[in-house]
């Protein structure tokens, strides 16, 4: 996991020379529930944490728009992105804990749309604040979307020992 997505490195250095010289041919972005797309309602909080937004025009909302922008930059590596559960969640409700039914419906609709538009899969992470607030119900629902489209649902766990089976 190279973090080329989080810091907009894929746009700032599309050739990704350092990775190519090391033999890396593919980057899978959007790990740990954080992705560059979709950015619903124009929310940029997920991106702003890692990158200076003055360096690139983040001009996409939907995953298809992100993919089009990426294609224009002609990356030097294969680049696939997961749709981030925490990114969607944060865009919908900020830091509140539980999604209401309508909000969950929006989250699932947007995740499904992102996969239809080319997202490689879905990612969640229970170690980050947004992911840690997610209910089992919404995580299972995202898993069902991944199954529906036969794509991975990658889940990051921060605690590999204590509390893992709780």
Features from the language model and the residues they span:
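Divalent-metal coordination cores built from histidine and acidic residues
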Residues: 12-121, 150
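Histidine/acidic residue-rich metal-binding segments in metalloenzymes
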Residues: 65-66, 98-125, 130-166
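Short, glycine/acidic-rich beta->alpha junctions
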Residues: 7-13, 134, 138
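Flexible loop/turn segments at secondary-structure boundaries
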Residues: 7, 34-38, 87-90, 129-132, ...
